[in-house]
């Protein structure tokens, strides 16, 4: 019974440490974002250029060739 209680307490302490470290990293990231500002972080998403709404006939033909 003592061993089970000790294992439970160690597991609770480790889980609490993980939860607190996640909050710490979140605060550090928010501080860095605040220092850089919105202009510095505006163009971090490179996937915006990938999703183009306007596909030409050549683009569609190229995609068809890729899918073969």
UniProtKB/Swiss-Prot annotation:
Instruction: List modified residues, type Isoleucine amide.
Output: 36
Q: What is the effect of changing residue 30 to H?
A: In Eval418-FH5; increase in viral inactivation activity, increase in enhanced viral attachment inhibitory activity, and gain in inhibitory activity against intracellular HSV-1, which means an improvement of intracellular uptake and distribution
Per UniProt, the keywords (alphabetical) are: Amidation, Antimicrobial, Cleavage on pair of basic residues, Secreted, Signal
Q: Quick one: a GO cellular component term?
A: extracellular region
Q: What is this protein called?
A: Antimicrobial peptide Eval418
Organism equals Euscorpiops validus (Scorpion)
Q: What does this protein do?
A: Probable antimicrobial peptide. Shows dose-dependent and time-dependent inactivation of herpes simplex virus type 1 (HSV-1) and dose-dependent inhibition of HSV-1 viral attachment to host cells. Scarcely suppress an established HSV-1 infection due to poor cellular uptake.
- Similarity-based family: Belongs to the non-disulfide-bridged peptide (NDBP) superfamily. Short antimicrobial peptide (group 4) family.
Free-text tissue specificity from the UniProt record: Expressed by the venom gland.
Q: Which residues form the propeptide?
A: 37-68
């Amino acid at each position: 019974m003592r061993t089970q209680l000790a294992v439970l307490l160690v597991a609770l302490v480790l889980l609490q440490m993980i939860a607190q470290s996640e909050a710490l990293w979140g605060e550090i990231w928010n501080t860095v974002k605040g220092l850089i500002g919105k202009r510095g972080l505006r163009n971090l998403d490179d996937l915006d250029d990938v999703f183009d709404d306007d596909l030409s006939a050549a683009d569609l033909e190229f995609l068809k060739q890729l899918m073969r």
